């Protein structure tokens, strides 16, 4: 049995580093290369920052990949954050179908500003609470030919929080996902398109149902020798009796880098970014980007003046075997900023 284990220790500077709210953005492990080495088994994000607070702290993350291509992931921080989960992707029916699944439990002290742009922009609204989450997701994806894939998707999401009067939500989701993928490389593409649409219907068996639609568009093109222009757009739209714990959010380690994921949330969230990636010398490269986002909902219609700006830059180190290390610093509105260490490109 081959064991791949990473233990990363990180120290934090108060108030200056990115705080990532959703643990699925802290670690995302995916085996996409046939070469077997230590770092090639790690595909995802690890932030050099407190996960949920601006206090000094330290933490560790690990990933264990079994021969059956099932990945066990974990993350622990001194502020009390804990995550444990599994990820898997298995071809079936002679490779015509693949079964993708994810399950994890996470506990974290985190912050909440309220719903909507106005509440998120008011620093005085910040409140603290403890969040527990258990998530199950599964998809059965069929290869339809000509780079097109589609299939059904199901999920179950359970969230409980203490503080702010406490409460609990749970929802069973079912729907479908379809995507078109012509990228030359999933980890760090230089050409191609990735277009994805997902529709999910949710019920908690005790209240009115709610619904979610997600649209994603990525394009990559080599503009000159060693230079790649990458474009990313994501739209998330929810409607019905949506609990606040399942509203779309802005921020994280992939999009709107530099914003606390969850500070801005509402029924609808859109974000876009344009990134220029340039090979500099030998194993060294760099990237710069500009980004923007907006949130709106039932009581607050879309307003262009409420757009959130973002920008940043970073260093790239390409290791033997094709693994790419990413060091990014992003900043946004009102001095929000953060540093992110990632494995492979953000998108």
Whereabouts are the PLM-identified features?
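Outer-membrane beta-barrel domain signature
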Residues: 35, 47-51, 73-75, 123-129, ...
């Amino acid at each position: 049995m081959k064991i791949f284990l990473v233990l990363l220790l990180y120290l934090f500077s108060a108030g200056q580093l990115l705080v990532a709210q959703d643990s699925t953005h802290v670690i995302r492990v995916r085996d996409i290369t046939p070469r077997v080495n230590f770092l090639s088994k790690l595909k995802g994000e690890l932030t050099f920052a407190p996960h949920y607070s601006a206090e000094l702290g330290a933490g560790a993350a690990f990933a264990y990949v079994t021969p059956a291509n099932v990945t066990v992931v974990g993350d622990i921080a001194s502020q009390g954050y804990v995550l444990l989960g599994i990820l898997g992707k298995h071809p079936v029916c002679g490779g015509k179908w693949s079964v993708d699944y994810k399950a994890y439990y996470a506990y974290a002290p985190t912050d909440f500003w309220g719903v909507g742009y106005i509440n998120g922009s008011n620093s005085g609204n910040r409140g603290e609470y403890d969040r527990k989450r258990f998530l199950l997701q599964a998809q059965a994806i069929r290869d339809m030919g000509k780079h097109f894939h589609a299939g059904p998707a199901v999920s179950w999401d359970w969230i409980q929080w203490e503080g702010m009067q406490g409460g609990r939500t749970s929802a069973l989701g079912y729907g479908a996902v379809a995507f078109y993928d012509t990228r030359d490389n999933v980890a760090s593409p230089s050409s191609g398109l990735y277009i994805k649409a997902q529709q999910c219907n949710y019920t908690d068996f005790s209240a009115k149902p709610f619904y979610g639609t997600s649209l994603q568009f990525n394009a990559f093109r080599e503009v000159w020798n060693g230079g790649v222009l990458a474009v990313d757009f994501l739209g998330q739209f929810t409607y019905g009796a949506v609990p606040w714990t399942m509203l779309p959010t802005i921020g994280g380690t992939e999009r709107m880098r530099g914003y606390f994921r969850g500070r801005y949330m509402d029924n609808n969230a859109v974000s876009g970014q344009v990134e220029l990636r340039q090979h500099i010398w030998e194993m060294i490269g760099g990237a710069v980007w500009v980004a923007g986002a907006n949130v709106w909902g039932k009581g607050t219609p879309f307003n262009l003046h409420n757009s959130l700006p973002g920008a940043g830059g970073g260093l790239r180190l390409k290791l033997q075997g094709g693994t790419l290390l990413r060091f990014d610093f992003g900043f946004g509105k009102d001095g929000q900023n953060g540093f992110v260490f990632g494995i492979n490109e953000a998108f």
